[in-house]
Amino acid sequence: MGLIVFSVAILPLLGIGGAQLMKAETSGPMKETRLTPRVAETARALYIIYLGISAICVIAYHLADMNFMLICSLNFALHFVAWRRKSLLAYWRSTEARCCLAAFLMLAAGTAFALYYTGAYPEPLEAFRTAFFAVASTASTTGYASADWSNWPYGIPFILLLSSAVVSCAGSTGGGLKMLRVAIIFSQLRHEFTRLLYPNAVTPVTIDAAEIPNKIVFSVLSYAFIWLLSALTGVLLLLGSGMSPLESFSAAVASITNLGPGLGSVGPAGNYQALSDLQLNILSSLMLIGRLELFTVFVLFSRAFWKP
């Protein structure tokens, strides 16, 4: 959001267009879609929504200790559409939002059942509340913790950690690959399976009944590959620096998704204080790469970028 204001308010004064910078800063593959005809109007509308949600969140915190993590993991463009049309149907009509909410509810319900079934939380209401908060925090990459979920049973810690990579929507405050990219990848896989069974069938990749251009599909696949390669490189570098496999994997994922807590000594009950300078620099690089959506960082190392 900060770069959006910079592109709208500062660059025009310098005679430099801000549209490309805003496009680079906006998360998600559908960056060509504009909510309003002008970049300034789009930035203004998104900031009104952002500040409005922040103000409501402050009031809700004060009155009832509520949190808005799940709301902020949805696409802010959907908030804009719902606000403009005075209707909540915009959320239901969005495949990405439905998948995000469905994934959240399934994770929360499964986690709550596991905590209650294993006796970790004997009270059903406490199990549900703790699970709900943990899933909302990890899925939205907020990083808050009301319990040390790294010690929960049935592989729940790994599921929660991986949820930080896929549940948040594009155009939200969350990190990771984003749900829209995951939906496009699965749609592309379905397209390939259909082509194998019916070679002459015409089955375009679609999201919300709209055909996704091949340019965007290839961009999503490239992004997913580079994202996974960056995370794997981080894991290998951390392993080489002396970290344990569990902590290397969790710290790398937690950093590139901007989640924060990982597993083991870097879990919700721990911190990164004991790590060496080399390990902290590796994780800092992953945080920067993940926050700026990869290509924005990697293009700086391209020789063509610096050519006049």
What do the predicted segments below correspond to?
Residues 1-308:
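Membrane-proximal intracellular helices of multi-pass ion channels
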